[in-house]
Every structure is written in structure tokens, then in C-alpha cells.
A protein has these predicted regions:
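Hydrophobic alpha-helical segments at protein termini of multi-pass membrane proteins
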Residues: 1-211
């Protein structure tokens, strides 16, 4: 399940979604001048592609087995490969510079200005992102296995998009405080996890589905 999760993330988020971005930014280059439109587009695109990949991957996995472990495993693979590609590469570059590898002055200056707090914040953000992916995977798993209506897939798309808003605003410079941005991300991700836990309790704990 983890391998399917990793593969679907790569295929849907890193290939198909990037192709859409290339087409949209080519046809509508002015979208970057409108923060609200740019944020809405980017967050909804991420939610749509990643949750559609989740839906397709879990639909494939659940053909023979419908156990909760499939949803959990998918979330580990999806969130794990994202963390490895996003945070892992940055951590490797930072470690290499700190160990004395040659780097451009701009890189070393940026690392010095960021301080240890930025690295801690990145780690906390990745943990929060992993929890989000686990929760959304369980939500889509419940939809695939008919424990909840299929429209919960669309709820997953919107929840994913909402969780991406703070990071998008931070990238646009509209959230200048790193800790403010991280605090909002943690709060939103925690709210999503609590929502999914509530749905899971009602659908699977209090009214378990046989088979």
C-alpha cells in the first residue's frame, strides 16, 4: 500500500499536476498577479490531483482487501515520499553546506539568516503534513469501501486545499511570520484530523461494516 501511495503521489502530483500548471501559466500568465486567484487555483489543483490519486490508488488496493491498514499504508507512502522529496533534499543540501561543502554565498547567507528555528519549523510542518495525509487517506478509504458516501472524496479535496492555504499565503509573502504560518498549518491540520476521526468513529467504530 505504501508503494502505491508513493507512486500515485509521484504520478498525480509531480507529473500530471505539473503539466496542468505548465498549461495554465502559459495560457494565463497574469494569474500570478492576483494573490486570491493564484492561491485558490494552486490549492484546489493540489487537492484535486492528490486526492484523485488517492481515490484511484485505494480503489485498486481495495479490490481484494478492505482493511484499514490499506488506508494507513497508503498515507504513509504518500506522505513519506513527499517528505523525502521536499524536506529530505533541503535537509541534505543544508547538511552539506554546514559540513563545509562549497556553496554559493547566497546559499550560505540564507542558511545563516534562517537559523535553527527554520529547520525545526520545517520538521514540525512535515510531521503535520504526514498526519494530514494519513487522515485524508483514511477518509478516502472510507469512501472507497462505502463506509461513508462517495462525496466524502470531494470533502477530502476541499480539506486538502484548505490545508494548503497557509503555506501558499506564506510563499506569496502575505504571511510574513514563519511561526504564525506554522501555527496556522498545525491548527488546520489538527482540525482535519479531528474531523476524520469523528467520521471514522461514526462510520467504523459505532457502525462497523462487515466484509
Amino acid at each position: 500500500a505504501a508503494l502505491v501511495g508513493a507512486g500515485c503521489f509521484i504520478g498525480y502530483a509531480l507529473v500530471l499536476e505539473q503539466l496542468l500548471h505548465a498549461a495554465v501559466f502559459s495560457l494565463f500568465p497574469a494569474i500570478t498577479l492576483y494573490p486570491a486567484a493564484y492561491t485558490a487555483y494552486g490549492c484546489l489543483a493540489a487537492g484535486l490531483f492528490e486526492e484523485t490519486g488517492r481515490l484511484m490508488g485505494l480503489s485498486l488496493l481495495c479490490k481484494k482487501d478492505r482493511d484499514l491498514a490499506l488506508g494507513v499504508g497508503y498515507g504513509i507512502g504518500h506522505g513519506g515520499v513527499e517528505a523525502a522529496l521536499l524536506a529530505g533534499v533541503n535537509a541534505a543540501v543544508n547538511a552539506a553546506v554546514m559540513l563545509g561543502a562549497p556553496a554559493a554565498p547566497q546559499v550560505t547567507d540564507a542558511l545563516g539568516a534562517a537559523g535553527a528555528g527554520a529547520f525545526w519549523a520545517a520538521g514540525v510542518e512535515r510531521i503535520a503534513a504526514m498526519a494530514l495525509h494519513m487522515a485524508l487517506s483514511i477518509l478516502v478509504w472510507m469512501a472507497v469501501t462505502r463506509r461513508v458516501p462517495i462525496w466524502y472524496y470531494f470533502a477530502a479535496v476541499l480539506l486538502h486545499a484548505a490545508a494548503n492555504i497557509p503555506a501558499a499565503l506564506s510563499q506569496l509573502g502575505l504571511l510574513r511570520s514563519m511561526w504564525c504560518s506554522e501555527g496556522i498549518i498545525l491548527a488546520v491540520n489538527a482540525a482535519v484530523c479531528l474531523f476524520v476521526w469523528s467520521v471514522y468513529r461514526k462510520a467504523c467504530v459505532h457502525r462497523p461494516l462487515a466484509g
